[in-house]
Amino acid sequence: MKNAGPSQRQLRVAEQVRHAVAHILQRGILLDDVLKDIVISVSEVRISPDLKIATCFVSPLSTLKNTSHTDVVNTLNKHSRFLRGEISHALRQMKYMPELRFRLDNSFDNFSKIDALLRSPEVARDLHHSDKDED
């Protein structure tokens, strides 16, 4: 049962890491020009079974015109050691602080594409026809 999914401990620690990283990003203590005036959402954290690597899925909600989402993620990865030290204050109970890795969260984009497909006239027509067939 190796692929049974994350354990309860992994889920609990991942949520604590997500909360701590989100709190640090919200406070704005990272002094970097790329991250200036940008709101970053930490949607999910996945942690390895040994609790030593935490992959944080982030999505920049507002970026400047000359800053891409990839630049934001690269900047967060550049400052991951600093962030790791900062979250250590919130996660004192852990023996080892997990290494933070940041990835761009594309789930919001996928949701909007699916929503647009479901609202398309072709799908609406098919749904309308299937409702009449059931009557």
Swiss-Prot record:
Keywords tagged on the record: Cytoplasm, Ribosome biogenesis
Family annotation (SUPFAM superfamilies): Ribosome-binding factor A, RbfA
Cysteines paired by S-S bonds: none
Pfam families for the chain: RBFA
Signal peptide residues on this chain, from the entry's feature table: none
PROSITE patterns membership: RBFA
Keyword hit for Cytoplasm: yes
A biological process term (GO) from this entry: maturation of SSU-rRNA
Subunit composition and interactions: Monomer. Binds 30S ribosomal subunits, but not 50S ribosomal subunits or 70S ribosomes.
NCBIfam families according to UniProt: PRK00521.2-5, rbfA
Protein name: Ribosome-binding factor A
